[in-house]
Amino acid sequence: MAHHDPIGLIAPNAGLAQLNERSREIFRQIVESYLATGEPVGSRNISRLITVPLSPASVRNVMSDLEQLGLIYAPHTSAGRLPTELGLRFFVDALMQVGDLTEPERQSIQAQLASVGRAQSVEAALGEALTRLSGLTRAAAVVLTAKSNARLKHIEFVRLEPERALVVLVSEDGQVENRVLTLAAGVPSSALIEASNFLNARIRGRTLAEARLELETALSQDRAELDQLTQKVISAGIASWSGGANDDRQLIVRGHANLLEDLHALDDLERVRLLFDDLETKRGVIDLLGRAESAEGVRIFIGSENKLFSLSGSSTIIAPYSDGAGHIVGVLGVIGPTRLNYARVIPMVDYAARVVSQMLGG
């Protein structure tokens, strides 16, 4: 089911394949302890966990060998060990057993999509799928999808600061798009209201492209009726829509808050802050997810295997989904810390992609 061939992965050491059963079990315990707690684990605890009776000294000898192979390392001055990114990759590819979803988990994903109903947009359904996936995995869920030609319903300008405003675009199918707009100095609130009224009178029922053409024409004809500051607000608003006009794909993210749970140290908080910064770099995320559009099944990127998340030490598990004709039309998945529960998250992402494909197939 899962496809583990990330771009940029350094080939594992040939010695990994030669690990004996004892070494594999000790390594497995180190990884599983890390995935469960995020903390380093020492030889004394490992000797209690493994099925083969070994003294802590014997376990330390094996751990030394694992460290030389690049599978584990000692963080700071800790006596315990953590898996490296190479170690996590080896665990996912060679040792991990991917489980099946429970029936309640399957039903939860299906029910969340079914609750949207056919009257809602594809984006709304994908948003619901992400909300459920994010809740089940306790990570951030993402989807890359084609932009729709939804018809506009309403626009509003919300002042954030004296020279910055939020442009809120609402479409007839319930989509909401926000853009931050830089205002000219001295723009009063009355100009924002007048600009909103001018735009709302002309955009309703039109696509973004249609509205842009209509507004450019109307603005040139009605300049005498509008003061200069209002004209500038309207022109800036139109320009902010044009900013994404050449990109035919959109990124939806749900569950940022999940990444703030279970933080163990300031280092964890710093990694999450870096991940938030990465997620704001939408072009980078879109390019990353786009890699899965030509793949079959689930793709897994661990830490620096993907340059975008190399600083935050994050993992990405993604899968493509298809339309009724079997064409891949988007990608969904989760982004979280490298200690994701891979055995549980991989089948969830795979199943969510299959359910979305079935929904789009009618």
UniProtKB/Swiss-Prot annotation:
- Keyword terms of this UniProt record: Repressor, Stress response, Transcription, Transcription regulation
**Keyword Transcription included in the entry's annotation:** yes
Please list the disulfide bridges.
none
Pfam families tied to this protein? HrcA
Question: Which molecular-function annotation in GO is an example for this chain?
Answer: DNA binding
Keyword Transcription regulation part of the UniProt annotation = yes
InterPro entries recorded: GAF-like_dom_sf, HrcA, HrcA_C, WH-like_DNA-bd_sf, WH_DNA-bd_sf, WHTH_transcript_rep_HrcA_IDD
Q: Name one GO biological process term.
A: negative regulation of DNA-templated transcription
Stored NCBIfam families = hrcA
Known function: Negative regulator of class I heat shock genes (grpE-dnaK-dnaJ and groELS operons). Prevents heat-shock induction of these operons.
Q: Which protein family is named in the record? A: Belongs to the HrcA family.
Q: What is this protein called?
A: Heat-inducible transcription repressor HrcA
